[in-house]
Amino acid sequence: EREERLYRLTVPTGAGKTLSSLRFGLYHARKYHKRHIIYVAPYQSIIDQNAEEIRRAIHNDEIVLEHHCNVIHDDEREKIRYEILTENWDSPIIVTTAVQFLNTLFASGIGNIRRMYSILNSVIIFDEVQALPVKITKLFNLSVNFLTAFGKSTVVLCSATQPLFDELDENRLLPPLSMAGNPKEYAEVFKRTKIIDATKGAGSGFAAEELQEFIWDKAETLKQVLVVVNTKKCAESLYKEIKKKCKGSDYILFHLSTNMCAEHRRDVLKRLEENLENEKKVICISTQLIEAGVNLSFKCVIRSLAGLDNIIQAAGRCNRHGEAGMGYVYVVGISSELENVERLAEIRKMQESMTEVLNQFRKNPAIFDHSLSSEESIRYYYQIYLRKRMPEMEYLVSVNGVDVTLLDLLSTSKTMWESMSESTKKDSKNLLLKQAFKTAGDVFEVIPEDGKVDVVVRYDEKAEKQIAILEDEYATLAEHKKALRRLQPYTVGISEQFRQKLGNAITSVCGGTVYVLSQNYYSRETGVSEEPLGMEFINF
């Protein structure tokens, strides 16, 4: 009933954030005459799941616009209509990614400027707000403050693990109003899991054989186990070792990582869901991609040490519907020989912060309400973690060899002005604005490319058919474009170093602009492979 414009919805994973926030958005938009409801999620998997859920709730596909890179239209007229709609976000309900939304605020490009108008006087729902990149924290805070204080927009921040953006030393978020009251009041109602510290204290973590035994022991007891690790290499290695143990047993083993194309992952998730529902014995080894936008429920989850937000997200895949009374989530340390995160600074800082939480929890569990998923635990974790990441929160970039922050470029541009020569300063002294808007827009990117190369894989007959069109020198440009759109779900991003390592296993088509992976370098189990699969070719 209130017109406050900044809200926080804190409810446990699986407690219905999407429909609750949508219901609020519809009511609020009608009561206060808001122009749009914009639903923003950080991951494509969440968009895929929740866009369909929103459509079912609304009963009208025509008023829901999805804007992300995976939307494919084969009909040229439909494609043109879609491009016009996404240029302006001219639909009552927009479902989009954090990348598209943040680009609208900060990136260069005519389309982004046009969409800026549409986010004013709207209801904006940010799902899984804790997953936003740390580097944009202060820019995000200031933009939300602007939208709510001056843009007549209402913003809802949804998360099971709300980050303390309103408690930073500077450039903090304005204090949000809690939509669901005190989380403690309903925490017990939704409590379906218990997080258990199995990190072995100050030890170096499980070696490969120890971890396999730990997983097997839980599988023998609980029958359906999900294991989530931090690296693709660890997931593949662990999968291959567990596969040996499963030989001759009635366990069904699955692997999930971004080494697999999106269509492959969809197929695996579908088979996983069927086997879990049919009470089959299941072990799934996955990277963190399974932690969001995946409606699966295992009897037990084993999570490699990570941030508490990741651990609680993983716990959301355990006993999801309360069918097992209480589900158990084990946090384990893994040796650096099996899971090397030395070059993954973000994960290391998460692990360091979580280790401090676990150490304090062992000493005095009462201050955490005897639960690692309590509000006290989440708060303590973020106090440590955000303090470690504070220097990164203003979006550090290098412009013409000068280290500067995007926050500075968009405010006083002090660093750039100080680096100018005296003659340049003299020529520019009469400028009305000192902000470097164009430079900031040009360098802004939510997720850096990091030298990733897209490679098309020959996963199934549909992919083969489209690749054949790309290889056909007599195919028209329109046919090539349509084939490329249809091949989006069959694309895997790999590093340039990995591409070079694969050598002749990758060929190029369309004048060298599209890379295609050889069939025998793509496994039906684990995706892109460093080595040829021998006789394990894909058979159609």
Which sequence ranges carry the predicted segments?
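SF2 helicase catalytic motif II
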Residues: 99-101, 112-147
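Conserved helicase motor
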Residues: 65-77, 230-233, 253-269, 285-291
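C-terminal helicase lobe and adjacent C-terminal extensions/tails of nucleic-acid helicase motors
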Residues: 148, 209-216, 220-224, 228, ...
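Walker A/P-loop
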Residues: 3-25
